[in-house]
Amino acid sequence: MHNKQLLLAHRGYSFIAPENTKLAFDLAFEYCFDGIELDVHLTKDEQLVIIHDETTLRTALVNKEVEFESLVSLKRDDHSAFFHLKIQFQSILTLKEFLDLYLDKFKLINIEIKTDQKPYLGIEKKLVDLVKGYGKKAIDKILFSSFNFESLQKVYDLDNSYKKGFLFWTKKQFETISTARIQKICQFLHPWTKIYEKYPQMIKKLNLPLNLWTVNSQNKFQQFLADNHVYAQIANKKFEIKIN
């Protein structure tokens, strides 16, 4: 489907740095990943912040629910606290801080809208309003994904300029949304690697390029590299093409 698959750093270079932090994103650039996959939630004061979970407990070791905290409150905590090595303090980033720093550095930025557990009312409009400020560059480089198809529908309704990918990790999730609707709204599918390997024909029949997550071994990387349905592989580690 294209000449060169992309390799996206899953929450930044999260194998060697704390996920979704500036350090992880800096290292993804230094190690020449093609792009970044990251997760976005909405704070009490309606700031778009980059974190995977709905709470800060796992990463900052302080139990705060993102939707009930202000940005100032969340900025106080060190999101490298969970990491197995001592490193410099890593403050939670806003999406704007990230885009200002990294939009120019990567080919593709995959923003996962984390509305599968909490609705975060209005998050889609805030996302579209923010990325519009970056003009054509954002249209070229930004891809929104979500397990919640309604969030992708909302982005489509607000502004259909931006790429969208449907995330799923079960057959049931995939079959809940009609093929026609997926093909209308989305330019990509984002299946879990194991579900893709189990039901390849079911997924390929939509004829949409695939962004696979999460690729964890060199062998799998090489295997998917030979699959012309795959547009990008999303991985915690950096893999290189090996020529036998």
UniProtKB/Swiss-Prot annotation:
Q: Which SUPFAM superfamilies match?
A: PLC-like phosphodiesterases
- UniProt KW keywords: Hydrolase
Out of the domains of life, which is the source?
A: Bacteria
For molecular function, the Gene Ontology terms on record are: phosphoric diester hydrolase activity
**Could you tell me which InterPro entries the record lists for this protein?**
GP_PDE_dom, PLC-like_Pdiesterase_TIM-brl
Transmembrane region(s):
none
The identity of this protein, by name, is Uncharacterized protein MG293
